[in-house]
C-alpha cells in the first residue's frame, strides 16, 4: 500500500464525481499528484509505465469535464489507462496490477463501470465508440462518447474504416475522437502517416487560418465569397497540416494542441462539448512525461518490473538463460548471413520480437510495417511470389488479426512464408487479450501449413531453419520466457518434416507432449515408467510413430499449452479414428475459457499442465499406475 497522506488532493478522489468537486484551478496540482502516485505505484508493482505518464493531463481533463460513466470513454490499446483506473475507484489496488486476482492491466468491463470497452489490441476504439454513439442515439440518450487513440494505433486500417463510416453518417453521431500523438507505439511509430502527423505538430498556423475564415464568413455559407474563402482556407491548410485528411472524411478537426497544458486541454474540450457531429481533437504528448528517465528511454520504460524510481531501471548482473525471443534474435541474424533471400517483417514489434540487432545489421532486409498485421502477412506473400524468403515475426495474439491473409494470400497459394510466432500458449500477466492459447487450433486446420512447437531452445532454432527451407507456409510457435536451458550452437541444422522424438521408452501409457509441455511430461513419464514422446510437429503428425505406439500401448495422453478444442490432441484423435483405431485417450490442455492475468506458472498449474497437474490427471484416469505393473489397463480406463 502507498501512504496517501502525501497526496492530499488525490487521496480525496475515489470516483470522478470527487474530482469534479475541485475547482478548475486545482487540476494542474491534481495532475502532478497523479503522476507522482503512478511513478511510486508502478515502481512497487511493475507494469505499463511510460504510456500512462503521457496521458495524465488528458485523463484528468476528460474525467473532470465529462459525466463519466454516463458519458463514455473508450481507450485504445489500454496500456495507458493506469491513471484512469486510479481516478475511477482503483487507486488503492493499482499496486496489484497484473497480479493474480489484482487489477487488470487493460480496461475490463467486468472490473469497473468506467471501463466501457475491453481492450488490449490496438485500433479498435473508434469502431467501438461509434457503435456506442449510434446505440445511444437510437435510444434517445444525449450521452457523449469519446475515443482516445494513439500510441501508433492510427496506422491500422480498421481506424479508417471507422472514420469513413462515422464521417458519412446521417444523422451525424455525437462522437469525439482524441488523437493522442506521441510518435510511439511500443517502438517508434513508423510510416507515411506518422510523418504527416509530425508535420502538424509545429503548426500554429492552421487554427489562425480557420478562425480568420470564420470571421470573414460569419453566417454566410453558400454565396460566392464563402466559396472563395473556403477554397483559400483549404489551400493554406494543405500546406501546413494533415487536417484535410480528417475533414474530408467528415470530421471537424481541432489542433494540434499541447496535451500537457491542462488549461488549453480544458478549454478545447469545453468548446468541443458544444459542437454536434463527429469531432477530432489532435493533442501532442510525450510518452513518459514527468519522469526524465522514461522520457529519455520511452521504449525501455514502456513496461517495467518493480524498480526504485530514484535510481531507475538497473540491469541485473550475471549470466542468464536466453529467452525464446533471444534464440530467434540470434537465429535470424545467422540465417540472414547464410540466406541472402531472407527478409523479415514485423508489425511494430521490433523489441518484443527480438529484431533490434537484425534491424541494425540488415536494415535493407528489415520491414517494420507499423501496427498493420493484415498488411504484414500479405506483404510477405507478395515477396514470396518473387522468390524471397520472408519471415513474419509476430506475437500469437496479433496473428489473429492477420488470419484471413494467412489463409487467403499465403496458404491458398502455397507460398514460402515462415511465421515466427512468439508468445504462444500461456502468456501470463497481460491477461486474455494477449494470450496465445488459440494458435495451434487455428493453424492446424489450414491446408498446406506445417506447424511446429519446440520443446527447448535448440529445437526452436532447428525448427526455424526447417521452416525457411520448407517449400510452402510454415509456422514455429514458441512460448514467452526461457526454456529448459539446453546448449545452443551456431549451426542452421534442420529437422525432418513430421518426425517426432522418443524421449523415454516405457510401457502401458504414452505421454505425447507438444512444445513447452514436453519437459513436464517427461518428468512424469520417467517417474511412472511411461513412454514419453516429444511430438515436435502439430502438423503433420508423425503417423508412423503414433500407429506403432498404438500397437504396444493401452492409452494415449496428449499435452499442449493450447485450448483442447481443435488442438494438437484433437489431431491425434482424428488420425487414430481415420485408421479405425479405438483406444483410451486423455487430452490435457487449456480450458474452454479465456485466460485471466496471473503468472505463467500459476496459469499452467490451474490448467493442470504443469508436472503436478499432468501426474494427477494420469493417475486419476489410470489409478493402477501407482501400484500395478500390469500392462492391460483398458478396463481401468473405462
Curated annotation (Swiss-Prot):
<dbReference type="GO" id="GO:0052865">
    <property type="term" value="P:1-deoxy-D-xylulose 5-phosphate biosynthetic process"/>
</dbReference>
<feature type="binding site">
    <location>
        <position position="151"/>
    </location>
    <ligand>
        <name>Mg(2+)</name>
    </ligand>
</feature>
<keyword id="KW-0479">Metal-binding</keyword>
<dbReference type="InterPro" id="IPR009014">
    <property type="entry name" value="Transketo_C/PFOR_II"/>
</dbReference>
<comment type="function">
    <text>Catalyzes the acyloin condensation reaction between C atoms 2 and 3 of pyruvate and glyceraldehyde 3-phosphate to yield 1-deoxy-D-xylulose-5-phosphate (DXP).</text>
</comment>
<feature type="binding site">
    <location>
        <position position="79"/>
    </location>
    <ligand>
        <name>thiamine diphosphate</name>
    </ligand>
</feature>
<dbReference type="InterPro" id="IPR049557">
    <property type="entry name" value="Transketolase_CS"/>
</dbReference>
<dbReference type="Pfam" id="PF02779">
    <property type="entry name" value="Transket_pyr"/>
</dbReference>
<keyword id="KW-0460">Magnesium</keyword>
<dbReference type="GO" id="GO:0030976">
    <property type="term" value="F:thiamine pyrophosphate binding"/>
</dbReference>
<dbReference type="InterPro" id="IPR029061">
    <property type="entry name" value="THDP-binding"/>
</dbReference>
<comment type="subunit">
    <text>Homodimer.</text>
</comment>
<comment type="similarity">
    <text>Belongs to the transketolase family. DXPS subfamily.</text>
</comment>
<keyword id="KW-0414">Isoprene biosynthesis</keyword>
<dbReference type="GO" id="GO:0016114">
    <property type="term" value="P:terpenoid biosynthetic process"/>
</dbReference>
<feature type="binding site">
    <location>
        <position position="373"/>
    </location>
    <ligand>
        <name>thiamine diphosphate</name>
    </ligand>
</feature>
<keyword id="KW-0784">Thiamine biosynthesis</keyword>
<keyword id="KW-0786">Thiamine pyrophosphate</keyword>
<comment type="pathway">
    <text>Metabolic intermediate biosynthesis; 1-deoxy-D-xylulose 5-phosphate biosynthesis; 1-deoxy-D-xylulose 5-phosphate from D-glyceraldehyde 3-phosphate and pyruvate: step 1/1.</text>
</comment>
<dbReference type="InterPro" id="IPR005475">
    <property type="entry name" value="Transketolase-like_Pyr-bd"/>
</dbReference>
<dbReference type="GO" id="GO:0019288">
    <property type="term" value="P:isopentenyl diphosphate biosynthetic process, methylerythritol 4-phosphate pathway"/>
</dbReference>
<dbReference type="InterPro" id="IPR005477">
    <property type="entry name" value="Dxylulose-5-P_synthase"/>
</dbReference>
<feature type="binding site">
    <location>
        <begin position="120"/>
        <end position="122"/>
    </location>
    <ligand>
        <name>thiamine diphosphate</name>
    </ligand>
</feature>
<dbReference type="InterPro" id="IPR020826">
    <property type="entry name" value="Transketolase_BS"/>
</dbReference>
<dbReference type="GO" id="GO:0008661">
    <property type="term" value="F:1-deoxy-D-xylulose-5-phosphate synthase activity"/>
</dbReference>
<protein>
    <recommendedName>
        <fullName>1-deoxy-D-xylulose-5-phosphate synthase</fullName>
        <ecNumber>2.2.1.7</ecNumber>
    </recommendedName>
</protein>
<dbReference type="Pfam" id="PF02780">
    <property type="entry name" value="Transketolase_C"/>
</dbReference>
<keyword id="KW-0808">Transferase</keyword>
<feature type="binding site">
    <location>
        <begin position="152"/>
        <end position="153"/>
    </location>
    <ligand>
        <name>thiamine diphosphate</name>
    </ligand>
</feature>
<feature type="binding site">
    <location>
        <position position="182"/>
    </location>
    <ligand>
        <name>thiamine diphosphate</name>
    </ligand>
</feature>
<feature type="binding site">
    <location>
        <position position="182"/>
    </location>
    <ligand>
        <name>Mg(2+)</name>
    </ligand>
</feature>
<dbReference type="GO" id="GO:0000287">
    <property type="term" value="F:magnesium ion binding"/>
</dbReference>
<dbReference type="GO" id="GO:0009228">
    <property type="term" value="P:thiamine biosynthetic process"/>
</dbReference>
<dbReference type="GO" id="GO:0005829">
    <property type="term" value="C:cytosol"/>
</dbReference>
<feature type="binding site">
    <location>
        <position position="291"/>
    </location>
    <ligand>
        <name>thiamine diphosphate</name>
    </ligand>
</feature>
<dbReference type="InterPro" id="IPR033248">
    <property type="entry name" value="Transketolase_C"/>
</dbReference>
<dbReference type="Pfam" id="PF13292">
    <property type="entry name" value="DXP_synthase_N"/>
</dbReference>
Amino acid at each position: 500500500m502507498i501512504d496517501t497522506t502525501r497526496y492530499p488532493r488525490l487521496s480525496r478522489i475515489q470516483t470522478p464525481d470527487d474530482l469534479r468537486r475541485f475547482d478548475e484551478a486545482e487540476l494542474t496540482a491534481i495532475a502532478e499528484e497523479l503522476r507522482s502516485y503512478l511513478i511510486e505505484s508502478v515502481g512497487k508493482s511493475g507494469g505499463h509505465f511510460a504510456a500512462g505518464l503521457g496521458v495524465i493531463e488528458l485523463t484528468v481533463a476528460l474525467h473532470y469535464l465529462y459525466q463519466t460513466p454516463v458519458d463514455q470513454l473508450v481507450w485504445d490499446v489500454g496500456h495507458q489507462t493506469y491513471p484512469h483506473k486510479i481516478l475511477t475507484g482503483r487507486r488503492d489496488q493499482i499496486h496489484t496490477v497484473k497480479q493474480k486476482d489484482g487489477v487488470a492491466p487493460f480496461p475490463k468491463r467486468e472490473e469497473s463501470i468506467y471501463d466501457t470497452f475491453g481492450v488490449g489490441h490496438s485500433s479498435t476504439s473508434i469502431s467501438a465508440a461509434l457503435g456506442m454513439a449510434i446505440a445511444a442515439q437510437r435510444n434517445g440518450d444525449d450521452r457523449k462518447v469519446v475515443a482516445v487513440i494513439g500510441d501508433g494505433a492510427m496506422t491500422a486500417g480498421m481506424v479508417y474504416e471507422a472514420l469513413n463510416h462515422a464521417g458519412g453518417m446521417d444523422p451525424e453521431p455525437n462522437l469525439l475522437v482524441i488523437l493522442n500523438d506521441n510518435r510511439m507505439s511500443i517502438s517508434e511509430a513508423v510510416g507515411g502517416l506518422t510523418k504527416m502527423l509530425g508535420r502538424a505538430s509545429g503548426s500554429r498556423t492552421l487554427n489562425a487560418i480557420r478562425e480568420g475564415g470564420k470571421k470573414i464568413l460569419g453566417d454566410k455559407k453558400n454565396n460566392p465569397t464563402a466559396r472563395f474563402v473556403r477554397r483559400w482556407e483549404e489551400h493554406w491548410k494543405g500546406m501546413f497540416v494533415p487536417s484535410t485528411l480528417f475533414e474530408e472524411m467528415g470530421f471537424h478537426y481541432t489542433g494540434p494542441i499541447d496535451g500537457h497544458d491542462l488549461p488549453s486541454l480544458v478549454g478545447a474540450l469545453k468548446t468541443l462539448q458544444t459542437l454536434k457531429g463527429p469531432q477530432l481533437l489532435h493533442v501532442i504528448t510525450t510518452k513518459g512525461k514527468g519522469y526524465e528517465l522514461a522520457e529519455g528511454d520511452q521504449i525501455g520504460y514502456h513496461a517495467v518490473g518493480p524498480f526504485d524510481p530514484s535510481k531507475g531501471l538497473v540491469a541485473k548482473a550475471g549470466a542468464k538463460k536466453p529467452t525464446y525471443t533471444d534464440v530467434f534474435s540470434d537465429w535470424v541474424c545467422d540465417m540472414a548471413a547464410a540466406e541472402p533471400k531472407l527478409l523479415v517483417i514485423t508489425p511494430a514489434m521490433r523489441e518484443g520480437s527480438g529484431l533490434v540487432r537484425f534491424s541494425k545489421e540488415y536494415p535493407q532486409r528489415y520491414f517494420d510495417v507499423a501496427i498493420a498485421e493484415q498488411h504484414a502477412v500479405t506483404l510477405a506473400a507478395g515477396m514470396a511470389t518473387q522468390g524471397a524468403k520472408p519471415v513474419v515475426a509476430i506475437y500469437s495474439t496479433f496473428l489473429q488479426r492477420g488470419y484471413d491473409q494467412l489463409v487467403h494470400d499465403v496458404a491458398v497459394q502455397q507460398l514460402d512464408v515462415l511465421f515466427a510466432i512468439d508468445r504462444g500458449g500461456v502468456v501470463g500477466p497481460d491477461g486474455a487479450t494477449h494470450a496465445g492459447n488459440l494458435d495451434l487450433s487455428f493453424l492446424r486446420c489450414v491446408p498446406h501449413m506445417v506447424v511446429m512447437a519446440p520443446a527447448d531452445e535448440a529445437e526452436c532454432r532447428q525448427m526455424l531453419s526447417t521452416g525457411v527451407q520448407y517449400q510452402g507456409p510454415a509456422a514455429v510457435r514458441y512460448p514467452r520466457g526461457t526454456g529448459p536451458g539446453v546448449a545452443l550452437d551456431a549451426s542452421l541444422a534442420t529437422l525432418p518434416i513430421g518426425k517426432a522424438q522418443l524421449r523415454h521408452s516405457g510401457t502401458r501409457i504414452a505421454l505425447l507432449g507438444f512444445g513447452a509441455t514436453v519437459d513436464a511430461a517427461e518428468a512424469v513419464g520417467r517417474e511412472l515408467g511411461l513412454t514419453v514422446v516429444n511430438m515436435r510437429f502439430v502438423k503433420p503428425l508423425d503417423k508412423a510413430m503414433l500407429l506403432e505406439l498404438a500397437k504396444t500401448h493401452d492409452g494415449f495422453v496428449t499435452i499442449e499449452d493450447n485450448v483442447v478444442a481443435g488442438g494438437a490432441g484433437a489431431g491425434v484423435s482424428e488420425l487414430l479414428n481415420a485408421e479405425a483405431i479405438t483406444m483410451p485417450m486423455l487430452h490435457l490442455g487449456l480450458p474452454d475459457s479465456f485466460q485471466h492475468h496471473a503468472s505463467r506458472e500459476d496459469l499452467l498449474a490451474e490448467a493442470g499442465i504443469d508436472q503436478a497437474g499432468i501426474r494427477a490427471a494420469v493417475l486419476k484416469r489410470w489409478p493402477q499406475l501407482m501400484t500395478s505393473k500390469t500392462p492391460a489397463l483398458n478396463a481401468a480406463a473405462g
